[in-house]
Amino acid sequence: MAEGNNKEEVIHLNNFPCHRGKEWMAVREGPITISDSSDEEGIPMLVTPATEQQEDDLDDDVILTEDDSEDEYGGFLDLESGKKEGEAKPGPSSKQTADDIVNPRLEQKVIILGENGLLFPESEPLEVQNQSSEDSETELLSNPGEPAASVDDQLIGEEYWLDHPYFQAPNPQPQERTNQVVPQERHSESEMGPMFFRHDFPEPAFPRPEPQQEGIPGPASPQPAHPLGELEDQQLAIDEDPGPAFPLSGPQEANLANMWEQEAAEVDQDLIPLLVKETEARFPDVASGYVEEIIHLKNYYDLNVLCNFLLENPDYPKREDRLIIHPSSSLLASQDDAKLPKIDFFDYSKLTPLDQRCFIQAADLLMADFKMLSSQDIKWALHELKGHYAITRKAFSDAIKKWQELSPETSGKRKKRKEMNQYSFIDFKFEQGNIKIEKRMFFLENKRRHCRYYDHQALLPAVKQEQEFYEQKIKEMAEHEDFLLALQMNEEQYQKDGQLIECRCCYGEFPFEELTQCADAHLFCKECLIRYAQEAVFGSGKSELSCMEGSCTCSFPTSELEKVLPQTILYKYYERKAEEEVAAAYADELVRCPSCSFPALLDSDVKRFSCPNPRCRKETCRKCQGLWKEHNGLTCEELAEKDDIKYRTSIEEKMTAARIRKCHKCGTGLIKSEGCNRMSCRCGAQMCYLCRVSINGYDHFCQHPRSPGAPCQECSRCSLWTDPTEDDEKLIEEIQKEAEEEQKRKNGENTFKRIGPPLEKPAEKVQRVEALPRPVPQNLHPQMPPYAFVHPPFPLPPVRPVFNNFPINMGPVPAPYVPPLPNVRVNYDFGHMHVPLEHNLPMHFGPQPRHRF
């Protein structure tokens, strides 16, 4: 048989030219080796003659081993389709019976060949006795006239070689299976009891039934053949009345159910912890051990079934520490937690000093990267930057790049590489926050010859991580620079060709790649869209980003917004949009937790609000927003009056809320800083700031002319223009007076306590202080006092000053006063000792008066 071919060899005895009783007996003493090729020597197969049966000595049996395949079994081997089913068939041979006893796990097939070579299939079900292997061996060996021991040995050897994978077929064909009959003494079922064989190797927990063909009974599933050594510890399972695999009844069905439960329990040992973990992640408040108990009691091995059971029975036992959240809960997951951010090794404030080993490796790597720098300078910079490789290399790279840009050329021609010499230097500079490191570092005369190199696997984990981080960041920075250069070249090409496109908002000219568009293809630059979205989302609180073209009613597609807007603006836009959509659909049912502002939907008739936020889980009253455990059995007013401090706090909260107007449509709080009293919410609703009613336009306000601040004499409508501070103060005073009057009525005048902030004492009047005298500079030399002002005895005609007719007694007109310099202690504003002039006269006073000597 060729190597690699696992097909079984079938021996047809009718093909021998001579009678089976002549030449066969002559050569039965020696083994026969059957091989497909003379060049290849396979495993020898011993062919021994079967023991002759007493009923019919003309028919022999050929024993074929069954294939291990579980998908194809129970087939029918049809050697001749024209054979009738009603013909008589001989019984099994004693050789077959002996082999069944020796090898109970081996499922064999018996094909009975007649003299004409036709197959006689068995049509009647045969009874199989529940007999142990020892009894069968004893009975077989006690039969006189037959060499039982030799037959058994030959049978064992034959089946062992046939079970070898060398003789197994690659594509086994479906074959017919028959039960073997051992002519032995029948025992009662009560004595032996039904026994079922169980494999040692793992099998499916729920075996599928075997289809029956041609009404031939057989076992429920095929039993693979094994060597005899593996079968010594196995039990022999023989059914007394073989029948179809399904259905079973009586004790057989009970034993089979027990076997299934036992195997299913083994499989579910790993499934139960997983089910408990996933269920507790979805129901974090369930009591510990309750889920596992439900799984065992109700046999719920499906996550959906467990969740439905807990949802349908909300009164399940809850854990006492309800605020403790399961760490794997999906409610705690977010986009930031999904992927932990990596350490930014370029941020000096987040770095911690490394140990000496990392410092040495980082210094060796830097000395190999910068061979023209001194090792002392490299170690100094590395020490100043806490021994981190990435940030130190970036600082050196920036300094070298700046030196390459600013260093002068030695000649007029541009060189590809600058020459370095001992007089060259770089200015190492690192600035980040309050940290500033500077040092001038000179280049070496020659490059460093000896450097220590490290294999990537030999680096310490911290140094390896920083090296990978630096390479990744440098790659990203290079790609970004290339992208910016490409955009610049693209814009220059657009400008050269005159193909720049105008923005419909700022009317600037941009290339097409820097523009975005609305659904109607109106083009806008990205900067205009970013500013428009930022103002709409953060300023107006709107989520509707309509087109900025005046006549267009379209909006910007979400794909365009995701490409243009930054992440912060985009997330806020989605948040606003979700809030408006939920508020529009469930305006009356949307409730927010007073502690964490977590939104949830609650029926209008439900008063208790349980916060679904796993970090909060507080139960509060929907109306007064007080804790439900203190509110149970009391109304909101009774709860407020029960505690004086809480009552006062509630009144003060009302006074604080008086400054805030809430939209009647979406409940958004509004505060007026300036403008008219017509308030517009982001949801589109309009309300009056004074009376807080819903309005539409300006018809609600007074339309008559009147003086500012004076009431209208013709109508009682609200004023369009008022001071918001005065309106809020009036409303707060009204709430305060009502609360104080109610407190006096209940507790009396003696126990009255003021509600609200204490009264502010009027500011004390400060006596008016006259203007301080003009400070006189303290000169080094004392200034001589001016002469007394004396009027001349008679008027003199005015003399126009000319360059050569100045009067002798008249000095130059002084310049205006200049304050002294802050850093100069001496003002040098000295008066002339021999020219008595009045320095304090204003400039428009005219010429100085004359003095008599």
UniProtKB/Swiss-Prot annotation:
Activity regulation field: Allosterically activated by 'Lys-63'-linked di-ubiquitin.
Residues that coordinate or bind Zn(2+) 5: C688, C691, H704, C712
Coiled-coil residue spans: 463-479, 725-751
Zinc fingers, RING-type class: 503-552, 663-691
Chain positions recorded as Zn(2+) 1 binding sites: C503, C506, C525, C528
Catalysed reaction equations from the record: S-ubiquitinyl-[E2 ubiquitin-conjugating enzyme]-L-cysteine + [acceptor protein]-L-lysine = [E2 ubiquitin-conjugating enzyme]-L-cysteine + N(6)-ubiquitinyl-[acceptor protein]-L-lysine
Pfam family, one: IBR_1
Stretch list, region TRIAD supradomain: 499-716
SMART domains in UniProt: IBR (SM00647)
Annotated knockout phenotype: Deletion mutant mice are viable and grossly indistinguishable from heterozygous littermates. However, knockout leads to infertility in male but not female mice. In addition, RNF216-deficiency leads to down-regulation of the gonadotropin-releasing hormone signal pathway.
Stretch list, region Disordered: 33-102, 125-152, 165-228
Biased composition (Acidic residues): 53-73
Pathway noted in the entry: Protein modification; protein ubiquitination
SUPFAM superfamilies reported in the protein's UniProt record: RING/U-box
ZnF (IBR-type) ranges: 571-636
Entry PTM: Auto-ubiquitinated. Phosphorylation at Ser-719 enhances acceptor ubiquitin binding and chain-type specificity towards 'Lys-63' di-ubiquitin but not di-ubiquitin with other linkage types.
Recorded GO CC terms: clathrin-coated vesicle; cytosol; glutamatergic synapse; nucleoplasm; postsynaptic endocytic zone; presynapse; Schaffer collateral - CA1 synapse
Enzyme Commission number, as recorded: 2.3.2.27
Catalytic center residues: C676
Residues given in the record as Zn(2+) 4 binding sites: C663, C666, C681, C683
Cited CDD domains: BRcat_RBR_RNF216, Rcat_RBR_RNF216, RING-HC_RBR_RNF216
Domain notes: The RING-type zinc finger domain mediates binding to an E2 ubiquitin-conjugating enzyme.
Protein name: E3 ubiquitin-protein ligase RNF216
Gene name per UniProt: Rnf216
